[in-house]
Amino acid sequence: MLPAQNKLTSSVQFRTTMRKGRRAGSSTVVVHLWDSAESLDGTGEKGEVASFGGPRFGLIVSKAVGNAVIRHRTSRRLRHVCARIAADSPELLTPTHHVVIRALAGSGQASSQDLERDIRHGLRKAGRVRTDK
C-alpha cells in the first residue's frame, strides 16, 4: 500500500506534473517527473518549497488498459511498485519530486517485475535517477 504522504492528492498537482515535468515512456507506462522545488516562473532557480514525506506518486489507469478488474489489478501493482521506489527514496528521488505514471494498454498483461523495470527505466530516462539500479 502506498502511504498517504506519498500520494498526489489534487488535480492541480497532477496537472502541474504532467505539464511542467519531464516525460519518458515504455511499452507499458509513461512516467512524468517534476521537481516541485523548481520555480514556476521559468527562471530555472530552485524555489523554497516545504515538502514532507515525498516523493509523491499519482496513477492514471484508463479504460484502454482493460475492464474494471484488470484496471484495479494494474493499479494495485503500480501502487506496490511505487511504494518500493519510495522506500528507496534517499538514493532515487528527493521529497520534492512528483511522479505521475500513466498506464498504457500493455500494462494490463505485464507482470509486477515488468512494470517496476519500466518505471525505473522511465525515471532514468527522465534524467533524475542514477543508473546503478
UniProtKB/Swiss-Prot annotation:
Signal peptide: none annotated. One of its GO terms (biological process) is tRNA 5'-leader removal. Its EC number is 3.1.26.5. Coiled coil: none annotated. Keywords: Endonuclease, Hydrolase, Nuclease, RNA-binding, tRNA processing. It catalyses: Endonucleolytic cleavage of RNA, removing 5'-extranucleotides from tRNA precursor. InterPro entries: Ribosomal_Su5_D2-typ_SF, Ribsml_uS5_D2-typ_fold_subgr, RNase_P. GO terms for molecular function: 3'-tRNA processing endoribonuclease activity; ribonuclease P activity; tRNA binding. One of its GO terms (cellular component) is ribonuclease P complex. Belongs to the RnpA family. Consists of a catalytic RNA component (M1 or rnpB) and a protein subunit. RNaseP catalyzes the removal of the 5'-leader sequence from pre-tRNA to produce the mature 5'-terminus. It can also cleave other RNA substrates such as 4.5S RNA. The protein component plays an auxiliary but essential role in vivo by binding to the 5'-leader sequence and broadening the substrate specificity of the ribozyme. NCBIfam families: rnpA (TIGR00188). This is Ribonuclease P protein component.
